[in-house]
């Protein structure tokens, strides 16, 4: 993944290169089962849960001196209708805390994910340009004033291992 981030509040630009892995959870993954139980989600949802892990290198170097960060999040989609629902995340996209996000799938296949935290909200848009090329954009706003704090755009190329 190659992502550019624009922090409007700090008038900064960030370039990030990431390795992202998305995989379905295993039915016996103890971390996922605990996450489901802690959030009062039926353990039948373990079949829908998936894991996202990432390793990123950034120019800003916020995480440590060499600018590397990594992490993992459990995501559990809860369908409300064919095109809408919730995603319970163990770690959010913008804040490193648990969050319940709303999602909507548009007619063209674009996935919109809306997350609210204590003082900010984020809207992500994810769409596939081809089978192996995904684009993602996000806008982070202040909940108080709705001022735009940050925008980002990512191109993510699927790596197929043989």
Predicted regions and their residues:
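Soluble ligand-binding/transfer domains with enclosed cavities or grooves
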Residues: 1-162
């Amino acid at each position: 993944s190659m992502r550019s981030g624009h922090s409007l509040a700090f008038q900064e630009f960030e370039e990030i290169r990431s390795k992202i892995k998305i995989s379905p959870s295993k039915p016996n993954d103890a971390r996922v089962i605990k996450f489901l139980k802690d959030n009062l989600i039926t353990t039948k949802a373990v079949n829908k849960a998936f894991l996202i892990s990432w390793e990123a290198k950034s120019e800003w170097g916020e995480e440590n001196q060499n600018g590397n960060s990594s992490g993992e999040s459990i995501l559990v989609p809860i369908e409300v209708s064919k095109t809408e629902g919730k995603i319970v995340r163990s770690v959010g996209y913008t804040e490193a805390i648990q969050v319940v996000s709303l999602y909507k799938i548009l007619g063209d296949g674009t996935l919109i994910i809306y997350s609210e935290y204590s003082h900010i909200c984020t809207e992500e848009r994810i769409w596939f340009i081809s089978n192996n090329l995904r684009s993602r954009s996000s806008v982070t706003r202040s909940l108080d004033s709705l001022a735009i704090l940050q925008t980002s755009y990512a191109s993510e190329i699927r790596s197929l291992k043989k």
